[in-house]
Amino acid sequence: MKNETLHTQEDILKMLDSLLRPAEPFWNEFYANREKDVPFFENIPDENLVSYIQKERVSKGKVLELGCGPGRNAIYLANEGFDVTAVDLSAEGIQWAKERALAKRVQIHFICDSIFNLEVQNEFDFIYDSGCLHHIPPHRRMNYIELIDRYLKSGGYFGLTCFAAGDLDERNGSEITDWDVYRGWSLQGGLAYSEEKLREIFKEFEVIEIRKMKQMKQPNDMFGESFLWTALFKKK
């Protein structure tokens, strides 16, 4: 008989993980068809990320990208002279990212694993998340914050984009409560956040900027969708 006794907090987290849709096979299937009409499949960086670099809000140094997917932001950062480590649990996404990096002749340390299994020796000057947070279930949110705090240097910056609550775009995330996730055992495509909730979640960080992402009409050399938040925080 399978032993399903819960002994530790980690056992509880893994049990809750198992009751939600498995993330790895979903994202492998998602990235397997590279011809799909998905805006962020284009090999272009987020407009807010470009603004951080151009305005020198973030100085060159060591960068960790969480949920890098096919690598578009990691490649941009490497091209700008950053030392980039990029993590994603999808083998399909990482393979695509490696091919793109090779084509662009940039060096990036790619890691194919869950961000919650990450074990690296470095501390980072900048951590970036483009669309990972809103796919993380509430019971893992504290682990996510702990991960950022562990790997981000004091005075370092953390940037993200995520679904914005209140936007009616059909591609936006769901506005269910944290409890509702477990009533229905689903994130319903991803969780939308209000500005107030972002400020509360990251209350231990200094808020540098929270704004809607600028809509970038394609074709373009930057990605931008106005149903997303962009945020930049500084570790105190």
Language-model regions: role of each:
Residues 125:
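Conserved acidic residues
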Residues 128:
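A conserved beta-strand element that flanks and buttresses the S-adenosyl-L-methionine
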Residues 131-135:
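Short catalytic micro-motifs in class I SAM-dependent methyltransferases
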